[in-house]
């Protein structure tokens, strides 16, 4: 056990985690040169296309150190985006140390800090690494000072490397072996294994990634899931050297995969503890804190026949993604679907794309909303995650919206722009600290503003230099209203949105104008209205298509023309009474883009 090292690689987006993993795999000979490709651990094609890591991946390698010993390295490559930070915290729970990768050109950014604090809270040894020293803009001296100044760990002798060219990666490994402590645990004690992650394989059933804390797990053992008390047979187990390799046993301190032929997707929840059926452990291992979704949206299959397939797909996906929340929902406009909870907009996009690709579904998404806390006049408190669940205006005593605490790091030059943006988003400044030429800003901004497009706008006002990390702080009373959209006098539940009263007039008008362009013209007038309660705040009309009934009249008497026009008018009126309006998918997406074009 003294030769095992478990560690994660944590860093801000694009600071070179996955590339560093590639080099480590190459040096330790996990894959032959022929099998090697860039970002070998980003196995999902979605990850490769966007150039981001979504799922944490684990690898077990053997490394022959300069002291002559061979060490077993179990390492986990983690995502950098704030939406996937739960992946990072889960990975860290399986480790004793973490490599904090910092780009020697960009310096410390918000995610660097957030991930580093997560690691420190779990009492992990954090080893700083300065990456990308081959860049002309690299300034390792300044960045080392920044790490000390902002993060507060000693970085004077931080390893310097370039993962792209491979310079200094050997030193990273030596430092790892030296600084990160070996796992603790009792190899002879009763088995305790933590489920770090799981996914569904169509042939094998549920595959779990586990970390053995105490005891040993052998092939053929009967294992028991501690939370449900279910027992299963350990059919196959092994490690990833990125490839799946079978082993006969997993020893104390190791990280590996396990297949128990579990068909039920809720059979082995992530964060649970496995133990042996014949010699069970007393205590459950501390799991992970449940992450609360921050953004909710309705997902509906385009054709209602896909509902069953959609339900199964969500089940399989939620096994792989513990933070996905879903419950059935029906809408008069869109039929049956699910209300899903996500950690952020990127997470929502990724889930939707994975459902469409991996499970071949066509989906419609409604506008994302956050959770509001509503105190009704009868003094009960309810949580509302969709505009249609909001009680009538006269039944609401107080409506509270979630406030996010946003930590931003940015160069001083962009401070003015960023403050303007935060104020526009109804933010309140709580803290501001200067570190060299970097500024650390803390704002409290309503969650609804943060999840919509705050991140994109922050990046564009600061030319990509500002970085953001946010977390939920509290609920705060606020003057929010629900804007309904009426089409020919009928409410369309899927188009409603909750917004601040000050913005409601503008949001309503923009939405109505946008819908006008998107709804195709029909044989009768379509009135599109935005309303708060019964009060109409905006309206526009999609004009009807009409035939020129006077074309055959040539000269003709005025009364003849009037008769024809009157007849047409009556026909249109009858049509309007029975006519239905088809809404295209773009109309539902219009809500997302309200307020984007006029900036």
Swiss-Prot record:
Subcellular location, record wording: Cell inner membrane
Span of domain tr-type G: 2-184
Membrane topology type: Peripheral membrane protein
GO biological process, one term: positive regulation of translation
Binding site for GTP: 14-19, 131-134
Gene Ontology terms, MF aspect: GTP binding; GTPase activity; guanosine tetraphosphate binding; ribosome binding; translation elongation factor activity
Tagged with keyword Hydrolase: yes
NCBIfam families cross-referenced by the UniProt entry: lepA (TIGR01393), small_GTP (TIGR00231)
Protein name: Elongation factor 4
Native source organism of the sequence: Shigella dysenteriae serotype 1 (strain Sd197)
């Amino acid at each position: 056990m003294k030769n095992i090292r478990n560690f994660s690689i944590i860093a801000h987006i694009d600071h070179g985690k996955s590339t560093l993993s590639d080099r480590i795999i190459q040096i330790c000979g996990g894959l032959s040169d022929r099998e090697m490709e860039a970002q070998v651990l980003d196995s999902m094609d979605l990850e490769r296309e966007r150039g981001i890591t979504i799922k944490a991946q684990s690898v077990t390698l053997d490394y022959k150190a300069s002291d002559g010993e061979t060490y077993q390295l179990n390492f986990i490559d983690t995502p950098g985006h704030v939406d996937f930070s739960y992946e990072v915290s889960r990975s860290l729970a399986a480790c004793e140390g973490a490599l904090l990768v910092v780009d020697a050109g960009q310096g410390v950014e918000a995610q660097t800090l957030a991930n580093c604090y997560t690691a420190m809270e779990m009492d992990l040894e954090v080893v700083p690494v300065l990456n990308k020293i081959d860049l002309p803009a690299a300034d390792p001296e300044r960045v080392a000072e920044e790490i000390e100044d902002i993060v507060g760990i000693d970085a004077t002798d931080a390893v310097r490397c370039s993962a792209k060219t491979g310079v200094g990666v050997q030193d990273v490994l030596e430092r790892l072996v030296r600084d990160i402590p070996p796992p603790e645990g009792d190899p002879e004690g009763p088995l305790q294994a933590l489920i770090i992650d799981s996914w569904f394989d169509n042939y094998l059933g549920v595959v779990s990634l586990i970390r053995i804390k105490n005891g040993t797990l052998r092939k053929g053992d009967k294992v028991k899931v501690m939370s449900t008390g279910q027992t299963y047979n350990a059919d196959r187990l092994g490690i990833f050297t990125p490839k799946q390799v079978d082993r006969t046993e997993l020893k104390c301190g190791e990280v590996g995969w396990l297949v128990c032929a579990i068909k039920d997707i809720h059979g082995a929840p992530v964060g649970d503890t496995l133990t042996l059926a014949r010699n069970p452990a007393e205590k459950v291992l501390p799991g992970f804190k449940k992450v609360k979704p921050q953004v909710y949206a309705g997902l509906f299959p385009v054709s209602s026949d896909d509902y069953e397939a959609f339900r199964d797909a969500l089940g399989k996906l939620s096994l792989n993604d513990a933070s996905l929340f879903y419950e059935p929902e029906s809408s008069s406009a869109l039929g049956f679907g699910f209300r899903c909870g996500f950690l952020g907009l990127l997470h929502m996009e990724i889930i939707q794309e994975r459902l469409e690709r991996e499970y071949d579904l066509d989906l419609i998404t409604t506008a994302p909303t956050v959770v509001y806390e509503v105190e009704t006049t009868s003094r009960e408190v309810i949580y509302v995650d969709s505009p249609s669940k909001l009680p009538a205006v006269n039944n609401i005593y107080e409506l509270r919206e979630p406030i996010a605490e946003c930590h931003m790091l940015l160069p001083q030059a962009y401070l003015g722009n960023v403050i303007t943006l935060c104020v526009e988003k109804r933010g309140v400044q709580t803290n501001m600290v200067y570190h060299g030429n970097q500024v650390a800003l803390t704002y409290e901004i309503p969650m609804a503003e943060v999840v919509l497009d705050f991140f994109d706008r922050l990046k564009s006002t600061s030319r990509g230099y500002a970085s953001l990390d946010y977390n939920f702080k509290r609920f705060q009373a606020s003057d929010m209203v629900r804007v309904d959209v009426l089409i020919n006098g009928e409410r369309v539940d899927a188009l409603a949105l909750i917004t601040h009263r000050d913005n409601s007039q503008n949001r309503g008008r923009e939405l109505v104008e946008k819908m006008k362009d998107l709804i195709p013209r029909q044989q009768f007038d379509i009135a599109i209205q935005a309303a708060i309660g019964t009060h109409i705040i905006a309206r526009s009309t999609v004009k009807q298509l009409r035939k020129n009934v006077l074309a055959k009249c040539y000269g003709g008497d005025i009364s003849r023309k009037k008769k024809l026009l009157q007849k047409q008018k009556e026909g249109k009126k009858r049509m309007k009474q029975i006519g239905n309006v088809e809404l295209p998918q773009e109309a539902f997406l219009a809500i997302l883009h309200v307020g984007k074009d006029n900036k």
